[in-house]
């Protein structure tokens, strides 16, 4: 609040006291009230305008403001079980949700013991995380965020940043260079976040992991080093726009639709009829939860990441446990046999690296925002349609060999252009549904 606005509010409060004492008329008081109200509204509008203008440089501040304005908090349940029963109590719902979340994991429990199979990475270079790096990240902690299952709140860690930076740096370096991750860093409280659809369906909730804050601090340091290794080795994917430096929802949409528009323009110039485009929207089923650990580690090894960091990630993925936290009630623990934790720092970048080799052989346009994938191309003739279908088949083959599944019910095709022949496409054996509009990263297309 500005100094001028505080003075306006004080003036209104003073006018109120004067009016009550009979020192001024009601009309004079109302003038001060109106003036104050207008000034406050102008100030709020200016704040929101500044937030909107600064969304590219500080999007967290913008969305934090939006979330504070939301008065309605989405409730969980009641939940319907497989046998038709209804679960209403918080503990029962927590138990049932954790059972469901665990049911989507890849069932094959992989051997993640260090067998010396990592051969493509860099040399076993010592990882040196400095005290100043740790202290800086401690001071950047958001004191309003929730803690993890270790009950160490970020506000406490932030306030003690100077005192604990040195011992934490020692612990971090020992953990990474030995490849050993403490048990307490491999457990998570799961908060169910409602997506859309019926609230009685467990599949309509996203499991977000609240992991230990101390481990997240180390993850931030390791993420920086992993990104540096990937950039140095030229392994960073150009078509991935999700949680990538210099990329965003906006760059994803602009890049994709520039190419789609280019198809249309070239079609008009060359073919004498309007070029017809098809956009195929693809959606993975429980993408983050089903990433197979073994395949992920093989891919990381090929990307030239420091071997000590590879071994640390391997140990970090091994023997993970989760429980659901719902309104103070905690479910029992369940083993995590696949996936990368949503809510962790490394989870997003590991997923991005895992799907780096998801691609096509033709000139079709493929673009990604984390697990949201779009495939597009010209579809004037049967041969064009066949090329797009072959690309789809390649994507299905990739998903099968990488133990991932597309959610075929949510994968759709959109036809663009005049004289559209509305060719049909299949995702495996499933014929894709045609859609006339689609919400693409929050934008209605």
What is each model feature region?
Residues 284-368, 378:
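Conserved polymerase palm-domain catalytic core
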Residues 4, 54, 60-204, 209, ...:
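Surface-exposed loop/turn segments and immediately adjacent short secondary-structure elements
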Residues 143-152, 201-210, 251-302:
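Conserved catalytic palm subdomain of right-hand nucleotidyl-transferase polymerases, strongest
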Residues 390, 405-438:
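Short, conserved micro-motifs composed of acidic
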Residues 148, 187-190, 206, 239-244, ...:
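Catalytic palm active-site di-aspartate
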Residues 222-240, 268, 348-377:
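Active-site palm subdomain of RNA-directed nucleic acid polymerases
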Residues 1-88, 140:
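Arg/Lys-enriched, amphipathic patches
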């Amino acid at each position: 609040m500005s100094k001028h606005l505080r003075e306006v509010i004080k003036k209104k409060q003073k006018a109120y006291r004067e009016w009550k004492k009979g020192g001024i008329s009601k009309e004079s008081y109302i003038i001060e009230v109106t003036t104050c109200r207008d000034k406050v509204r102008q100030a709020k509008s200016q704040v929101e305008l500044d937030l909107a203008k600064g969304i590219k440089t500080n999007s967290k501040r913008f969305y934090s403001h939006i979330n504070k304005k939301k008065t309605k908090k989405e409730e969980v349940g009641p939940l319907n079980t497989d046998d038709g029963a209804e679960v209403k109590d918080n503990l029962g719902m927590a138990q049932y949700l954790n059972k469901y979340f665990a049911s989507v994991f890849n069932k094959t429990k992989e051997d993640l013991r260090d067998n010396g199979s990592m051969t493509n990475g860099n040399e076993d270079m010592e990882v040196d995380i400095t005290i100043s790096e740790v202290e800086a990240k401690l001071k950047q902690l958001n004191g309003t965020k929730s803690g993890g299952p270790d009950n160490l709140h970020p506000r406490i860690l932030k306030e003690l940043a100077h005192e604990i930076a040195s011992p934490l740096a020692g612990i971090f370096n020992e953990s990474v260079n030995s490849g050993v991750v403490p048990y307490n860093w491999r457990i998570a409280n799961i908060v169910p976040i409602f997506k859309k659809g019926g609230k009685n369906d467990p599949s309509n909730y996203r499991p977000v992991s609240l992991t230990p804050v101390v481990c997240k601090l180390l993850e931030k340091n390791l993420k920086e080093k992993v990104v540096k290794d990937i950039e140095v080795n030229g392994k960073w994917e150009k078509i991935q726009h999700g949680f990538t430096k210099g990329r965003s929802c906006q760059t994803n949409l602009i890049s994709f639709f520039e190419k789609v528009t280019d198809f249309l323009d070239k079609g008009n110039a060359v073919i004498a009829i309007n070029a017809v485009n098809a956009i195929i929207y693809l959606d993975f089923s429980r993408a983050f939860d089903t990433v197979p650990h073994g395949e992920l580690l093989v891919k990381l090894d090929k990307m030239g990441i420091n071997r000590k960091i590879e071994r640390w990630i391997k140990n970090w993925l091994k023997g993970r446990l989760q429980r659901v936290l719902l309104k103070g009630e905690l479910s029992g623990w369940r083993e995590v046999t696949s996936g990368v934790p949503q809510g962790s720092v490394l989870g997003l970048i590991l997923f991005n690296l895992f799907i780096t080799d998801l691609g096509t052989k033709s000139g079709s346009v493929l673009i990604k925002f984390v697990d949201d994938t779009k495939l597009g191309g010209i579809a004037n003739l049967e041969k064009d349609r066949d090329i797009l279908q072959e690309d789809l088949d390649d994507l299905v083959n990739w998903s099968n060999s990488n133990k991932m599944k597309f959610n075929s019910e949510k994968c759709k095709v959109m036809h663009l252009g005049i004289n559209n022949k509305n060719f049909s496409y299949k995702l495996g054996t499933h014929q894709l549904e045609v859609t006339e509009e689609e919400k693409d990263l929050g934008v209605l297309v």
